[in-house]
C-alpha cells in the first residue's frame, strides 16, 4: 500500500516538473519573438526613415509604368514574330516559286531544243545573267499603300545600244517589236532603203539576245543571234515573241497600200517565222484563206506577242468582209469608254450612233475594222494548229495595232488609240482551250496619244477616225491581290502632233514626274516599253524602245531608252 502511494506521488512530481519547463520555454520563445519584432521594426524605421502611407501613393504609378514597359517589350517581340512568320510562311515560298518557275522555263527551253535537234533547231539555249532570275515577267512593284505616282523614272541611262540604225539619209528603220522571257529577249524592226513611205520593198531585222550585267553593275542587252531578212519578201507589221524555241515572228506580206488591201476581196498573206538559237531562220505561210476566210485585210499588231500554255499569242487586226459570218456577228455591237471626270456633252443616242460608226471608218471603204488574237502551237513545226479569236465589240474598240503581254500570272491586250478614245487601254485577258477572252479594260487617263480632230488627245466623245500612234503601257505597280494599279510608258505629250516624247509612271487618273527625251518640239512616233528587275540589287528598270526623229541619217532612229524606277520619300 505504501509502495503504491509512493509511486503515485513520484508521477505527480514528474508531471509538475514537465509543466514548469513548458511554461519557461513558452515564455522564452515569446520574449524572443518580441525582441525580433522590435529589432526588425527598428531596422525598417532606420532604412526607410519611417515611411508613412502617404509615401506609398506613387507606387501604383510606378507599377503602371512597369506594365507599359513590359507590354511594349511584348509588342516588339510580337512584331518580330510576325516578321519571321511573314518571311517563313509567305515571302520565302514565293521566292522559291519564282526560282522554280525560272528553272522550269529554262528546262522547258532546253527540252524543246533537245527534242528538236534533229530538225536543226540548234542547241545552247541562251540565258540571262543570274542577277535577273525572278526579275523578268514578274509583278515588280507590289504596294497597296503608296501613291502610284510616287514612283517615277530616273534620267535616261547610258547603255549599250543593241538596235542598228540607218546609215544613209534615205534609210528608214521603223516599227519596233520587243518581247522578253525568263531566258532571252527578241527584237525586230523594218528596214526601208528609200524612205519611210515606200510600201513595195523592205528588209526585216530580227535579233535574239540576253540581259547582262557589266563588271561595274550596269545593265546591258547583249545580242547573240541576228539576221537581216533581205529576200524580196516584203514583210510588214511584224510582231515578235520570245518562246522556248527562239524568236517567233508573225508578219504580213504586203504588195499594195493599206487602202488597196482593204479594197480587195482576199485575205492578206501571213507567215509564221522563227529565229532559232542556232541563228537559222525558217518560216511558213499560214493558210489565210481558211484562217481569215471572213477577212479582206489582216495584219499582226506590231507589238510583241506572248508565250502562254505552250502556244504563242499574237495581236491581230484588219478588215472584215461585209456580210460575212464574223461581220454579221458584230453588227450593232459597240462600246463607249469615258474619260475621267470629263463627260461627253452629246446626247446618248448620238453617242451610240457615233460609237457604232467608229468601227467602219471611211478611210477603209466602210469595212469593219476588227480586233483579233491569233494563237499558234509552239513546236518544231511552224504554223501548227493556228486558232483565231475574234472578241466581241461590246468589249473592244475598233481594231488597231496592239500587244499581248504577260506579267506574273496575268495576261493583257493593249489596243493602240486609233479610234476616238485617247487614253491607254489594257484589257485583262484569260486563255482557255486555244482561245482568248478579253475583259473590261484598265484605262490610264493621263497616258494619252496625239490625234487628228475630232479624235485629238483631249477628245471625250465617240467619233469615227483612224489616228493616234502606238505607245504601249507596261504593267508595273500591283495590289497584293494581283490587280493592276499603275503602268510605265513613254507617251507623245501633244494634243495633235507626234511631238514631245516623255516617260512616266501612270495610275488611272494622273502621272508621275516625267523624264523628257529632249525638247517639246522633238518629233517621235512608236514606243514600246518593258520593265524588269535586277534581283541582286533590287533595282527596277524600264526600257522604252522609241522612234525618235533623226536629222542626218534617216527619218527615224529607233532608240532603246533605259531608266531606273525611283520613289519619292514618304509618299
Curated annotation (Swiss-Prot):
Region (Important for interaction with fusion/F protein): 124-152
A Pfam match: HN
UniProt keyword terms in alphabetical order: Disulfide bond, Glycoprotein, Hemagglutinin, Host cell membrane, Host membrane, Host-virus interaction, Hydrolase, Membrane, Signal-anchor, Transmembrane, Transmembrane helix, Viral attachment to host cell, Viral envelope protein, Virion, Virus entry into host cell
Record localization: Virion membrane; Host cell membrane
EC number annotated for this UniProt entry: 3.2.1.18
Subunit structure: Homotetramer; composed of disulfide-linked homodimers. Interacts with F protein trimer. Interacts with host CG-1B; this interaction inhibits viral adsorption and replication rather than internalization.
Record comment regarding domains: The C-terminus (head domain) is involved in binding the cellular receptor.
Name recorded for this polypeptide: Hemagglutinin-neuraminidase
Species of origin: Newcastle disease virus (strain Italien/45) (NDV)
Amino acid at each position: 500500500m505504501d509502495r503504491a502511494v509512493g509511486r503515485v506521488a513520484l508521477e505527480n512530481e514528474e508531471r509538475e516538473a514537465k509543466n514548469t519547463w513548458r511554461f519557461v520555454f513558452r515564455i522564452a520563445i515569446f520574449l524572443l519573438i518580441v525582441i525580433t519584432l522590435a529589432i526588425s521594426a527598428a531596422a525598417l524605421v532606420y532604412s526607410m526613415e519611417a515611411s508613412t502611407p502617404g509615401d506609398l501613393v506613387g507606387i501604383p504609378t510606378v507599377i503602371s509604368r512597369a506594365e507599359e514597359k513590359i507590354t511594349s517589350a511584348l509588342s516588339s517581340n510580337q512584331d518580330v514574330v510576325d516578321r519571321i512568320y511573314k518571311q517563313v510562311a509567305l515571302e520565302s515560298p514565293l521566292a522559291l516559286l519564282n526560282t522554280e518557275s525560272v528553272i522550269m522555263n529554262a528546262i522547258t527551253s532546253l527540252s524543246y531544243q533537245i527534242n528538236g535537234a534533229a530538225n536543226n533547231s540548234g542547241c545552247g539555249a541562251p540565258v540571262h545573267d543570274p542577277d535577273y532570275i525572278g526579275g523578268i515577267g514578274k509583278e515588280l512593284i507590289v504596294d497597296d499603300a503608296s501613291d502610284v505616282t510616287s514612283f517615277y523614272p530616273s534620267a535616261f541611262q547610258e547603255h549599250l545600244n543593241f538596235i542598228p540604225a540607218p546609215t544613209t539619209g534615205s534609210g528608214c528603220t521603223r516599227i519596233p517589236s520587243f518581247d522578253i522571257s525568263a531566258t532571252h529577249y527578241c527584237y525586230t524592226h523594218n528596214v526601208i532603203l528609200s524612205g519611210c513611205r515606200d510600201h513595195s520593198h523592205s528588209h526585216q531585222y530580227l535579233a535574239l539576245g540576253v540581259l547582262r550585267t557589266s563588271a561595274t553593275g550596269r545593265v546591258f542587252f547583249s545580242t547573240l543571234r541576228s539576221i537581216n531578212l533581205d529576200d524580196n519578201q516584203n514583210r510588214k507589221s511584224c510582231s515578235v515573241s520570245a518562246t522556248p524555241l527562239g524568236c517567233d515572228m508573225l508578219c504580213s506580206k504586203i504588195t499594195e497600200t493599206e487602202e488597196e488591201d482593204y479594197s480587195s476581196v482576199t485575205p492578206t498573206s501571213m507567215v509564221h517565222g522563227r529565229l532559232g538559237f542556232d541563228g537559222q531562220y525558217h518560216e511558213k505561210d499560214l493558210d489565210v484563206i481558211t484562217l481569215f476566210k471572213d477577212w479582206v485585210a489582216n495584219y499582226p499588231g506590231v507589238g510583241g506577242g506572248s508565250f502562254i500554255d505552250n502556244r504563242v499569242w499574237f495581236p491581230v487586226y484588219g478588215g472584215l468582209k461585209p456580210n460575212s459570218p464574223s461581220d454579221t456577228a458584230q453588227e450593232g455591237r459597240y462600246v463607249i469608254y469615258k474619260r475621267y471626270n470629263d463627260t461627253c456633252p452629246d446626247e446618248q443616242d448620238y453617242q451610240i450612233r457615233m460609237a457604232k460608226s467608229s468601227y467602219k471608218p471611211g478611210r477603209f471603204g466602210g469595212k469593219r475594222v476588227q480586233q483579233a488574237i491569233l494563237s499558234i502551237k509552239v513546236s518544231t513545226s511552224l504554223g501548227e494548229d493556228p486558232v483565231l479569236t475574234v472578241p466581241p465589240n461590246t468589249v473592244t474598240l475598233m481594231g488597231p495595232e496592239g500587244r499581248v503581254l504577260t506579267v506574273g500570272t496575268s495576261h493583257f491586250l493593249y489596243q493602240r488609240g486609233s479610234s476616238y478614245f485617247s487614253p491607254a487601254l489594257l484589257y485583262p485577258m484569260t486563255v482557255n482551250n486555244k482561245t482568248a477572252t478579253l475583259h473590261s479594260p484598265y484605262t490610264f487617263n493621263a497616258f494619252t496619244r496625239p490625234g487628228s480632230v475630232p479624235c485629238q488627245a483631249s477628245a471625250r466623245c465617240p467619233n469615227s477616225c483612224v489616228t493616234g500612234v502606238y505607245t504601249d503601257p507596261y504593267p508595273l505597280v500591283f495590289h497584293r491581290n494581283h490587280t493592276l494599279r499603275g503602268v510605265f510608258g513613254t507617251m507623245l505629250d501633244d494634243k495633235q502632233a507626234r511631238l514631245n516624247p516623255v516617260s512616266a509612271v501612270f495610275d488611272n487618273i494622273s502621272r508621275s514626274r516625267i523624264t523628257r527625251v529632249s525638247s517639246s518640239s522633238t518629233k517621235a512616233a512608236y514606243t514600246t516599253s518593258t520593265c524588269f528587275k535586277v534581283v541582286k540589287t533590287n533595282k527596277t528598270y524600264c526600257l522604252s524602245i522609241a522612234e525618235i526623229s533623226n536629222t542626218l541619217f534617216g527619218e527615224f532612229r529607233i532608240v532603246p531608252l533605259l531608266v531606273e524606277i525611283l520613289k519619292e520619300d514618304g509618299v
